[in-house]
Amino acid sequence: TEVTRSVQMYIDEANAEGGINGHEIKMITYIDGGDPAQAESVAEKIVQENKAMIVLGNGYSDPATAMGKVLAANNIPGMTSGATAPSVTEGNEWFFRVINDNTAQGSFVAQYASIFFGHKSAIILYEDNSYGSSLAVAFDDEFSAHGGTVFSNSPISSKSETLEKDIADIINSSEEKPDMFFLATYKRSGAVAAIYLQEHYPGIPVFGGDSLGADSFAAVVAEELGKAKADGIIDGIYAPAQLIFDVASERAQIFRDRYIKNVGEMPTWFAATSYDSALVTIKAMRAAGISGDPSQIAQDRLLLRDYLASIDQRSEDFEGVSGQIYFDEDHNYTQPLAMGLFSNDKFISAPVQLYHISDNDLPDDYLEKLRSGEILRINRQYFGRTRIIYVGIDINEFSELDIEGDHTYLADFYLWFRYEGEKIDFEDISFDNSVAPIDLGSPTEEKEIGNGHYTLFRIRQNFRNTFNLEDYPFDHHSLAIKLRHDTLERKDLIFVTDTLGIGEITREKTLDNLDKAHAFETISDWFPVTGFFFADS
């Protein structure tokens, strides 16, 4: 599973660094089947065996809650990387969560829909369990607080044999049609609902919960359609995600590359957060001073629990794939959720994202900005807006490589920008590592695509990077092309990888594209070993 693969990835890395005080870290695998009763049984088995320092995983809320009660009663820490219902950690001093809960998620989607889109009415369909109901309640409360009206808030079940009819009956029972639909569902019920809504109400926007916020949702939709692909039927559907790789950091790109190499498939945000759960746990074990002595396991568990609870602010010491991990008073990690949308069956970052604003950085007029929607408040934390610009590079050639002298190289490439909203002043874009300032000049191509803009440039310029020759003849060097906006900070604007334009951006695919373009043909004695596109911090 994604959990075991990701956790084992970090365990292998940690063991390569000496484990925990010289002790090797081992993973014991249990399967709860996504069922609360089975999860409770598994937890009781863990208690009886008395080997586990902590329990990681728990992708579903009801099983996680059931397991957490048993673990807490026996003073065993637990940490979920996927279960989002508030009940998972509420009142449980032994359970932690490395993602946002549904209170934060529902509030985020409601504010995004009402503030950024101006939606004033909604119909909610939710999974008939704690995940769906808590997400629906959070959305309903926040949407109503912003002056919205919820026409109906109804449960559906992915196990229903008449699911499509159930959905149709709910929608048809409403006398008025809403500005939007919100699907707080699992993937299968969400797929059936999305297909029905897109076929019968194509003009009404659809938002989903984080269960829908992944490329894998498109695969489930295709399966429901009986096709190989979803054929764009879910294009335009918005959903939040704990992490979207096209807007993520270099650390996230490295994780994705390693995961693909180890597993052979693209990771989801759940894989990333599962990796983070292992990272924060093992680092906490090292810092807490646990003995590793089986006879002291009860004391070690308490030390670990207490140390995890003490990680109550952002720190580079616990920086994972999804950011700097910490736990609030409810043992949740509240970070800026990413909002994505489907385009050509791919889940990509939406044109507007959020960034965290600390209490110390709140402007004096923050109350006014809260009312205007410039600042959002989610789970007692504040967030501002960030504009997203999709950027793509197509390398034609690297040449004139000077390793020992000026550390320069000539790059010939196409550069494009795809974005919505106000037009960009390209004079404000510069290249940090170009030998001489680059004037982009007139674009090679410029056109409107749907609601957005597309601008293409051809560039042939010299760039410079620092080359460390100490490891010669086994040295590795980076041929980087770094661009930024001169006047706007990252919190205002982020350049992200245009996965729609570039296509697959795995290490292997990137190298294959460079090889097909003969990009290194004129550089002798060197060959490419990796390639990344990422938004640097």
Map each language-model feature to its residues:
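Extracytoplasmic ligand/sensor domains, especially the bilobed periplasmic-binding protein
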Residues: R5, A37, K51-E161, G203-A239
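Signal peptide-proximal N-terminal region
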Residues: R5-M27, S144-G147
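Short, well-structured alpha-helical segments in soluble
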Residues: G33-M53, Q111-Y112, T162-K177
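Hydrophobic alpha-helical
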Residues: S61-A72, P178-H200, V280
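Extracellular/periplasmic periplasmic-binding protein-like sensory domains
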Residues: N100, A194-Y275, A287-G292
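Segments of small-molecule ligand-sensing domains
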Residues: K261-A271, K283-F347
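Extracytoplasmic ectodomains of secretory-pathway proteins
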Residues: R305, H331, G340-R380
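Non-transmembrane, solvent-exposed beta-strand/loop segments in proteins
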Residues: D364-E404, Y409-S537
